[in-house]
Amino acid sequence: MKLYSLSVLYKGDNKVSLLKSAYDVSSFSFFQRSSIQEFMAFTSQLIVERSDKGSRSSVKEQEYLCHVYVRNDSLAGVVIADNEYPPRVCFTLLEKVLEEFSTQVDRIDWPSGSPATIQYNALDSYLSKYQNPRDADPMSKVQAELDETKIILHNTMESLLQRGEKLDDLVSKSEVLGTQSKAFYKTARKQNSCCGIM
C-alpha cells in the first residue's frame, strides 16, 4: 500500500490551479521521477477539471487509483495511491487536509495562488504519515486488530482440539450440553455450511 501524491487545487470557472502538492516518487527510477511527478500533477488537474463541485470520486488508471474531492467552495484535493490503499482513508485524508488548508490559507488567495505563493507546508508530513493507513487512521487500526484477533481465536480453537478430533464429535459426546443446545449447534453448522464451496 502506497501513497504517491497529495495535491490541493482550486477549481475556477475556466481553469484549475494547482495550489500545493507533495509527491513520493522514491519507488520509481531516478530518471523517471520528474516525468512521473509532472504526469501526476497533470492528472490531478484533469480529474478536478472534469469533476463536479461537491463531489467525491475515484478514478482507476492501470494499477493506480486517483481519489478526488471537490468541495462546494471550489477547493479540491487529489490523492494518487496504489489500488490496495483503502479509499476510505484517502477521503478522510482529503477532508482533513482541505479543512486545515481552508483555515490556514485565506480564501482570497485561492483563485490566484500557485505552489510558490501559497504558504502551507503540511502536505509532505501528511503524505509521509498516511503511508501506513493503520497508523494514520484509527478505524483501519481497529479493523487490523480485529482481523488479528480472529486469526488468533481460530488458531486457538484448532490447537485445543486433539489430532483428528472434530468439534462436531465433541458436541455430540458432551454431557454438559443439553439437547436443545446440541440441536442449535447442528442447525447453525448446517446453515453456515450451505453457502460454502464443496
From Swiss-Prot:
EC number: 2.3.1.-
Residues anchoring lipid (S-palmitoyl cysteine): 194
Modifications the protein undergoes after translation, according to the UniProt entry: Palmitoylated; catalyzes its own palmitoylation. Palmitoylation is required for Golgi targeting.
Main location class: cytoplasm
Origin: domain of life: Eukaryota
Gene3D superfamilies: 1.20.5.110, Longin domain
v-SNARE coiled-coil homology domain segment(s): 138-198
Its membrane topology: Lipid-anchor
GO cellular component: cytoplasmic vesicle membrane; cytosol; Golgi membrane
GO molecular function: transferase activity
Proregion span(s): 196-198
Lipidation positions, renumbered (S-farnesyl cysteine): 195
UniProt free text on domains: The longin domain regulates palmitoylation and membrane targeting.
Family to which this protein belongs: Belongs to the synaptobrevin family.
Protein name: Synaptobrevin homolog YKT6
Native organism: Xenopus tropicalis
